[in-house]
Amino acid sequence: MGYQPQFTITPKLLSRVETVAALRERIQGAAVELSWIPALQKDTRTRNVHASTAIEGNPLTLEQVRALEEGREPAASDKRSRREVVNYFAGLRYVEKRVSIETLRHDDLFELHRILAGEVMDQGEAGRYRTINVRVGNYVPPIADDVSGLMFELLDWWNRHAGELSPVLSSAILHYRFEAVHPFADGNGRTGRALALWELYRRGFDTHHIFSVDEYYWEDRPRYYSALAKVRESGEDLTVWLEYCTEGLRQTLENVWLRVQAYNGQSATRLVLRPRHEQLLALLRDHGSMAPAELWQALKLSKQGTLNLLRPLMAAGLVEKVGSKKMGRYILSSP
């Protein structure tokens, strides 16, 4: 019978899919100045690597991950943590080079897992389906003897039927089902998230590879794991998981739009947004406008620290000050 995902297109899910599609079109339409694409791709790759490895407990900060990408060895970091990060960079590059593959095979999955999990496996062998039974918290995945057959079914669905759905949905379904089967002895989480990105890439949803959706999962890991668990609790009904993932894509694309504006602004400034910048921009997006004192209280920074954050954002045309000098407020600039 094969794998047949079960879900309901609720009004909430439909609305989120439509919102994500509109945001994507806006971003794609702005991607006309190709000179800045490589810098944004590099920043996105670094963010995805940091987020996906951090979900699994890797302690390296975003700046330390960025240092490794640039060939520098971050201070106070252990060998395994560095290896996990280096592996994930290599895994994403493997995926990026294979976006045109029409049919995914078991060997493609084995090679991706071999790259991601090489030298960092706690049990089992990288690049081979597990031969042992495993337990993940309270969840007991299928027994080892069933893994190969279940993965044949998943690959058959991915290759033959995923294209019938929006990539927003098919990537989320692939992500969940891979984690549910848990085909490898270790390293399934990061492999599943890489596969979800692969689906967005090969379906042409993220043609420039500038969407760092893994940050959404990392920023609230308990909610991420809870959303996965709710599918099992509901008898494999994926509806709540799809609503969660589409909300994540919506937030991700809103952040990407801010980054695109930072690179594609009217000024010559090209700004790489740091987490603090994005926190400030999110505050302005949510509140509409904020006084200086409101900003530094919300950010828990000094007045000078807040001004230091604001200057590059204003220089890049992302933020502007309106009103009088004494009573002025900060707002997001209109696109």
Residue positions per predicted region:
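FIC/Doc superfamily catalytic core
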Residues: 1-335
